[in-house]
Swiss-Prot record:
Its main location: cytoplasm. It is an enzyme of class 2 (transferase). Its EC number is 2.1.1.63. The keyword NAD does not apply. This enzyme catalyzes only one turnover and therefore is not strictly catalytic. According to one definition, an enzyme is a biocatalyst that acts repeatedly and over many reaction cycles. This is Methylated-DNA--protein-cysteine methyltransferase. One of its GO terms (molecular function) is methylated-DNA-[protein]-cysteine S-methyltransferase activity. The lineage of its organism: Archaea, Methanobacteriati, Methanobacteriota, Stenosarchaea group, Methanomicrobia.
Amino acid sequence: MYYHIIKSPIYPILLAGDEKGLKHLIFLKDERKAKIPNDWVENKDFFREVSNQLEAYFSGKLKTFDVKLAPQGTEFQKSVWKALCEIPCGETRTYGEIAKRIQNPKAYRAVGLANNRNPIAIIVPCHRVIGANGKLTGYASGLDIKEFLLKLEENNLK
């Protein structure tokens, strides 16, 4: 598995993946505490394209990513993550709407758990999922990041 850490406007980001695609995009709130497995190999060039796309996203020039993804999860989780990728930049959906989208309308809590386990933040945009009351709810990386990303997208659409 290859990895590379890039800078972002909010926190450093750990990218990890292999020839199958990107497996992880994780915000490092404290880079010093990042636990990189010993068998992972630093490879900046491997992540050049995704790094360029993330830079364009943060600068407001990119709204849709074109990155080969290889997240690891259950079939249910993968169906949720696929549905998340259909939410346009600058828009939000509720957990219930995602549950209906994957044709499992009662599974809104399970959708929330799948969101929480999303290994590829930003590109699989779990930050675009909000509570039924319109409020920001759970985000594995922290509500500060969720709020930052939603405001970034809102401002970039103006």
